[in-house]
A protein has these predicted regions:
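Bacterial N-terminal signal peptides that target proteins for export
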Residues: 1-9
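Bacterial N-terminal signal peptides
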Residues: 8-18
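Short S/T/G/P-rich N-terminal loop/turn motif that feeds into the first structured element of a domain
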Residues: 23-318
Length: 318
């Protein structure tokens, strides 16, 4: 029986990894002359490169996949969206990840520097008739593979985050922990997380995480994102638990347990694997690991050679 949730104890937070794609804070290219579009796209790329830390706003689309429709079947469907964005040279990127625990589902995460930047990106897509039409068509095809779909919008909380990096280029797995807070207990939750941060600092663990507050799409919840370059880093996280507990001490553990009981209504941790075939990564990720981010398309099965008819059997003489 767990007396303290793994979220607050940092069991699922000891990682070496990163947060999300840098976001854009200017309007995406619309129907303009090619020179104007190119200038605007270059400006947005420069701003993306200059942004440090996680984006302020995350827009997450969650797709629930029908049994038997995941894997290569869903990859092929999602690649249509990726190809459409690449053809339009769209400067807003997103990362896809598939569940390794819980219900079969996929997440598509896009980062923005602000809500205003998100609005401008949506408006620009609407004005790009060719891209809009292609995305609408692809949505119909993809919808046939899904059991359901929902969306959420998160807002970054730097005070509750701990050493959040800036790139997913070398990350392969994502641990996502959702903590639902009891009404009126935000202060207790903040105090608990800050205790966890201090204990990780004192214990010298490898922990890193980014925390986002659920802005739209649910209740009073916080989401922890912890990135892993490999599953070996998950092993490291559990192995470092003793460092964390020793740094916290018996009195600290007791206080943390009391805070958790006071403020946490429920918590859940799930593991996801990043899927490059369904992602539209920024150029710097691709340059960092081109073999991962530009996987070869699955080859179609080779055609079987035509079967030659067997010669007619000779009839014995009568």
């Amino acid at each position: 029986m767990k007396i303290v949730s793994p979220v607050l104890l940092g069991l699922s937070l000891a990682v070496v990894g990163s947060s999300f794609a840098a976001a854009q804070d200017t309007q995406s290219p619309q129907t303009q002359n090619p020179q104007m579009q190119n200038q605007q796209m270059q400006s947005m790329k420069m701003q993306s490169m200059q942004m440090q830390g996680p984006p302020k706003v995350l827009q997450i689309t969650r797709e629930f996949i029908k049994p038997g429709k995941s894997g290569a079947i869903h990859d092929k469907s999602e690649s249509n969206f990726v190809q459409a964005m690449a053809k339009a040279k769209w400067p807003t990127h997103y990362v896809a990840m598939n569940s390794l625990s819980g219900k079969l589902r996929a997440l598509y995460i896009t980062g923005y520097a602000s809500f205003d930047a998100w609005e401008k990106d949506n408006a620009a897509i609407d004005k790009n008739k060719a891209l809009s039409a292609e995305l609408d068509k692809d949505s119909v095809t993809d919808g046939e593979l899904l059991d359901g779909i929902d969306q959420a919008v998160l807002y970054y909380d730097p005070d509750l985050s701990y050493r959040p990096p800036t790139s997913l280029a070398n990350v392969r797995f994502m641990e996502i922990s959702v903590v639902k807070i009891k009404p009126g207990h935000r202060k207790d939750f903040s105090d608990a997380v800050k205790m966890v941060i201090d204990a990780n600092k004192k214990g010298g663990t490898s922990s890193q995480w980014a925390v986002f507050e659920l802005a739209y799409g649910g209740g009073d919840e916080y989401v922890f994102f912890s990135a892993d370059k490999s599953m070996a880093e998950i092993d490291t996280g559990y192995a470092e638990d003793k460092k964390f507990r020793d740094a916290l001490g018996d009195d600290g553990l007791k206080k943390l347990t009391e805070l958790e009981q006071a403020c946490v209504d429920s918590s859940d941790s799930e593991l996801f694997q990043i899927n490059p075939r369904q992602s539209y990564p920024p150029d710097d990720w691709v340059k960092a690991d081109p073999n991962f981010w530009t996987p070869k398309a699955a080859m179609a099965p080779a055609e079987k050679p035509a079967v030659k008819p067997l010669p007619a059997a000779k009839m014995p003489p009568r």
